[in-house]
């Protein structure tokens, strides 16, 4: 019969193995793995560029995060992403960044990041922020000011709104994935291609078909 210490050791090893199995962005197995965007190889992520061809510029991006972006759209916000898709040096490093500009009363509408937790820092202005848990849908919200931070747990529906009627606001988000992904709830439901069946949506939202038709007819503009 195995000793108690052996059983404890086995349990610990199994726990460590299962933790690795459920990790979204696994720890890198080399110093770096700059993404080779031209490679025909398809993997869960991106293959590595030849390390002998890597130079300092692969770890640099002139993101100009100090420059304001246009918020001339229906929602009054603009999200500028810095992730592995436009910064290959982030490949396997499990991190990305975003600048969010808000017009007066602008909104970053309810959305989720399926692969990342988000830490938001307010750089300018005052924001109303919040997230909704899984069922039974509890809301956690807060008014945050310049210098404040707020965290949105992974895959939770969340949002931000600039409360000022006259001044823009700016925030910066850090995310613990090289490619967090984003699903904007309204446009995903009413602007999917091909569209979701009216029968599904009328029952789900408990409204008449004409309401669903009107919502589907809207131009669901992206702020990304």
UniProtKB/Swiss-Prot annotation:
<feature type="binding site">
    <location>
        <position position="118"/>
    </location>
    <ligand>
        <name>Mn(2+)</name>
    </ligand>
</feature>
<comment type="subunit">
    <text>Oligomer (believed to be a pentamer but probably hexamer).</text>
</comment>
<feature type="disulfide bond">
    <location>
        <begin position="33"/>
        <end position="48"/>
    </location>
</feature>
<comment type="function">
    <text>Plays a role in broad-spectrum disease resistance. Probably has no oxalate oxidase activity even if the active site is conserved.</text>
</comment>
<keyword id="KW-0325">Glycoprotein</keyword>
<feature type="binding site">
    <location>
        <position position="158"/>
    </location>
    <ligand>
        <name>Mn(2+)</name>
    </ligand>
</feature>
<feature type="domain" description="Cupin type-1">
    <location>
        <begin position="70"/>
        <end position="213"/>
    </location>
</feature>
<keyword id="KW-0732">Signal</keyword>
<dbReference type="GO" id="GO:0030145">
    <property type="term" value="F:manganese ion binding"/>
</dbReference>
<comment type="similarity">
    <text>Belongs to the germin family.</text>
</comment>
<feature type="signal peptide">
    <location>
        <begin position="1"/>
        <end position="23"/>
    </location>
</feature>
<keyword id="KW-0052">Apoplast</keyword>
<dbReference type="InterPro" id="IPR019780">
    <property type="entry name" value="Germin_Mn-BS"/>
</dbReference>
<keyword id="KW-0464">Manganese</keyword>
<keyword id="KW-0964">Secreted</keyword>
<protein>
    <recommendedName>
        <fullName>Germin-like protein 8-4</fullName>
    </recommendedName>
</protein>
<dbReference type="InterPro" id="IPR006045">
    <property type="entry name" value="Cupin_1"/>
</dbReference>
<dbReference type="GO" id="GO:0048046">
    <property type="term" value="C:apoplast"/>
</dbReference>
<keyword id="KW-1015">Disulfide bond</keyword>
<dbReference type="InterPro" id="IPR014710">
    <property type="entry name" value="RmlC-like_jellyroll"/>
</dbReference>
<keyword id="KW-0479">Metal-binding</keyword>
<feature type="binding site">
    <location>
        <position position="113"/>
    </location>
    <ligand>
        <name>Mn(2+)</name>
    </ligand>
</feature>
<feature type="glycosylation site" description="N-linked (GlcNAc...) asparagine">
    <location>
        <position position="78"/>
    </location>
</feature>
<dbReference type="Pfam" id="PF00190">
    <property type="entry name" value="Cupin_1"/>
</dbReference>
<dbReference type="InterPro" id="IPR001929">
    <property type="entry name" value="Germin"/>
</dbReference>
<feature type="binding site">
    <location>
        <position position="111"/>
    </location>
    <ligand>
        <name>Mn(2+)</name>
    </ligand>
</feature>
<dbReference type="InterPro" id="IPR011051">
    <property type="entry name" value="RmlC_Cupin_sf"/>
</dbReference>
